[in-house]
């Protein structure tokens, strides 16, 4: 009998402003994208990426308004919309639309044994007093397992990228918690972003078997950076109270030419792991990728973080000493430039704030390629 499998499609679309959904609207009109198949939308918006970056919520509302014309309200809510603020340097604002379709493979032999697989999940609302603590780690771990199940991925070793959009604390949320007689992990709203990202990343590590729950405690979150996930990418935002999770990996139950692999940068200029991942995906070329090879790259997804040591390869950096510009903004620009030099384009999904996401000062890089 013919076999019905799922096939992933990835569309990288430009954005002229945080509310610009014209490219997505055109793709839907032309039939290139089926709204019913959208699993997740990741976007880089041109805000500051900090607590008061409302470009993320602006972009989400614009996407919801567009998709609401094609889908029921609950169907729109199920789409993971993860906006990452900050396009410092020459990083280009863009969105990446992840779509899944069912296809009938017929009786012909499959071109590839395994293909890109996508899954998503949402967690319950996280109480403010649980943010940055072990309760958040546990909640995210459960959410990642649910997203893996949605993707049909049973082996955590087949997962190459986990994107988590996590909440942060505002003074209003902190005061509401204190009015209930509880205290939050931190009272600094900007620091709360780091604690939320860090706890979420450790939740990914637990779900993927990189760490065990009994190895962790509240005191190690955002203090012991020797504990991390090599496949987590977490972004904080004011626009949600729960977690939106997308898992990307490889599965024999999916078909199509798309494949994903990842590497882990050991510091902000360590591009060789990304080059090695490209080689494993069939793009083993010296220097910057030539135009023909660039055309096969569906997405580049990376994390960036200023090293807590204050140094890059034993030479001092000033990213942590700048009182005017957050270190996450410096790191995005710096790592974005390093990766753009390798890939040859600037619409890279480089997200700042890599607490417990790769080694201190480094971070994971996932690459999705169309195989031939």
UniProtKB/Swiss-Prot annotation:
It comes from the Bacteria. Keywords: Hydrolase, Magnesium, Metal-binding. Homotetramer. It comes from Bradyrhizobium sp. (strain ORS 375). Gene3D superfamilies: Cyanuric acid hydrolase/Barbituras, RU C, Cyanuric acid hydrolase/Barbiturase, RU A, Cyanuric acid hydrolase/Barbiturase, RU B. Residues 115-252 are annotated as: RU B. NCBIfam families: amido_AtzD_TrzD. This is Cyanuric acid amidohydrolase. One of its GO terms (biological process) is atrazine catabolic process. The record marks 328 as: Important for substrate specificity. Pathway: Xenobiotic degradation; atrazine degradation; biuret from cyanurate: step 1/1. Mg(2+) binds at residues 305, 354, 357-359, 362. Belongs to the cyclic amide hydrolase (CyAH) family.
């Amino acid at each position: 009998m013919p076999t019905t499998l799922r096939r992933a499609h990835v569309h990288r679309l430009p954005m002229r402003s945080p509310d610009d959904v014209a490219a997505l609207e055109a793709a839907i009109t032309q039939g290139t994208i089926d709204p019913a198949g959208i699993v997740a939308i990741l976007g880089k918006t041109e805000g500051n990426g900090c607590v008061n970056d409302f470009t993320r919520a602006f972009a989400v509302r614009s996407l919801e308004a567009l998709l609401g014309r094609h889908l029921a309200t609950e169907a729109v809510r199920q789409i993971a919309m993860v906006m990452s603020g900050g396009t410092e340097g020459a990083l280009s604002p863009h969105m990446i639309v992840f779509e899944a379709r069912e296809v009938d493979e017929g009786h012909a032999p499959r071109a590839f044994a395994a293909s890109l697989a996508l899954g998503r999940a949402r967690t319950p609302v996280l109480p403010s007093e649980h943010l940055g603590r072990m309760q958040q780690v546990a909640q995210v771990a459960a959410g990642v397992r649910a997203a893996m199940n949605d993707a049909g991925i049973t082996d955590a070793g087949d997962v190459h990228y986990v994107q988590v959009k996590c909440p942060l604390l505002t003074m209003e949320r902190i005061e509401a918690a204190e009015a209930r007689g509880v205290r939050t992990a931190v009272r600094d709203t900007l620091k709360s972003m780091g604690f939320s990202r860090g706890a979420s990343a450790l939740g990914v590590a637990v779900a993927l078997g990189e760490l065990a729950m009994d190895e962790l405690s509240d005191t190690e979150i955002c203090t012991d950076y020797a504990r991390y996930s090599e496949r987590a990418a977490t972004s904080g935002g004011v626009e949600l109270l729960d977690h939106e999770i997308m898992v990307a990996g490889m599965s024999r139950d999916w078909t199509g030419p798309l494949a994903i692999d990842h590497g882990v940068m050991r510091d902000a200029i360590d591009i060789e792991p990304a080059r090695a991942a490209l080689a494993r995906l069939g793009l083993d070329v010296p220097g910057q990728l030539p135009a023909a090879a660039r055309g096969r790259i569906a997405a580049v997804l990376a994390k960036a973080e200023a090293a807590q040591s204050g140094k890059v390869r034993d030479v001092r950096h000033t990213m942590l000493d700048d009182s005017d510009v957050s270190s996450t903004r410096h790191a995005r620009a710096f790592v974005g430039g390093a990766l753009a030099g390798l890939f040859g384009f600037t619409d890279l999904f480089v997200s700042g704030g890599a607490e417990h996401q790769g080694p201190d000062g480094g971070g994971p890089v996932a690459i999705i390629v169309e195989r031939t």
